[in-house]
Amino acid sequence: MKKKRPVLQDVADRVGVTKMTVSRFLRNPEQVSVALRGKIAAALDELGYIPNRAPDILSNATSRAIGVLLPSLTNQVFAEVLRGIESVTDAHGYQTMLAHYGYKPEMEQERLESMLSWNIDGLILTERTHTPRTLKMIEVAGIPVVELMDSKSPCLDIAVGFDNFEAARQMTTAIIARGHRHIAYLGARLDERTIIKQKGYEQAMLDAGLVPYSVMVEQSSSYSSGIELIRQARREYPQLDGVFCTNDDLAVGAAFECQRLGLKVPDDMAIAGFHGHDIGQVMEPRLASVLTPRERMGSIGAERLLARIRGESVTPKMLDLGFTLSPGGSI
C-alpha cells in the first residue's frame, strides 16, 4: 500500500502560511519574501515533499518537461548529447523525459505518444525518419521541436548538427591523400546517417577515380562488428588497404583484428572512424577520426528549444556546428 505523501497544506501548516504562498514559492521563489523562502524550503526538506505535476498537466499549463527521444542508450554519442541537453534544462528548471526506441520508427511512435500524453513543453529528436503517425502527432501537438546530429537534411522545426556527408567525404579524401587506393566503407545499423556517410565516402572515391566498396550489417555497432566487417571486407576484397568506418566502435574493432593478424597500421591498413571516442584517441597509433561536437550540440539544441518555448524567434533554422578531422596516426 502506498504511503500518503505530504501535500501543499502540510507544508503550509508547518510554516504558518497559506497553501497559495507555498504554491507561489514552488512556481517562482522570487514571488515570496526572502524571510519566507528559507522557512518554506526547510519545511519542504523536512517533510520530503514531492511536487505533483498532474494539476498543471490537466490544466494545459506548462509542464516544464522536455521530451528527449534517443535511438540508443548504450551508444556513447547519445550519452554525451544528453549530458549537453541536461546541462541546460537543469539550469532552467526543466525536467527531461527520456525514452529510447532502438532505431525502430514504430517504437519511436509509441514512445512519443506516451510522452505527449504528459503535455511536454518541447521535443528533442536525433533522427529524421519517422512514421506518418509520428509526424501527425507532432503537428497536432504544436510544440517546438529541435532535431540534432544533422545540419543538412530537412527538419520539422529547427535543427542543430553538422554535415555528415561532407565529414565522410573529407575523411575519405584524407585517406586517399596518404596513398591508399583500395578503401572500403564499413557500416552498421543502416540508419540514415550511416547511409549519408556512405554517400560522402563514395563521392570522395569517385572524385579520385577509385571504385567504392561497402560492407554493411544491420546489427548494432560494436567492436566485434568491426572485427567481422573487416574480415568480410578482406575476404571479398583481397587488395584492401584501408577502411573508413561509420563510427569509432567499428574502427577500433578493425584495429584489433589487424593487430591479431600482424598487419601494420597504417602501412598495411589505414583505419579511420567517426566521432572521436576516447578509446580511439588513446590507442597506438592514435585512431584517425571525425571529431563531432556532441555535448555542445546537445546544449545549444536545448538552448534554442527553450527559446522557442518562450516564443522567441530562432535563426538560422538549421545551425551547423561543424566538425574537425583528426588524422591521428592510423591513416
Curated annotation (Swiss-Prot):
GO MF annotation terms: DNA-binding transcription factor activity; transcription cis-regulatory region binding
Cross-referenced PROSITE patterns: HTH_LACI_1, HTH_LACI_2
GO cellular-component term (any): cytosol
Residues of the HTH lacI-type domain: 6-60
Domain of life: Bacteria
InterPro entries in UniProt: Cro/C1-type_HTH, HTH_LacI, Lambda_DNA-bd_dom_sf, Peripla_BP/Lac1_sug-bd_dom, Peripla_BP_I
Protein known as: HTH-type transcriptional regulator GntR
Organism ancestry: Bacteria, Pseudomonadati, Pseudomonadota, Gammaproteobacteria, Enterobacterales
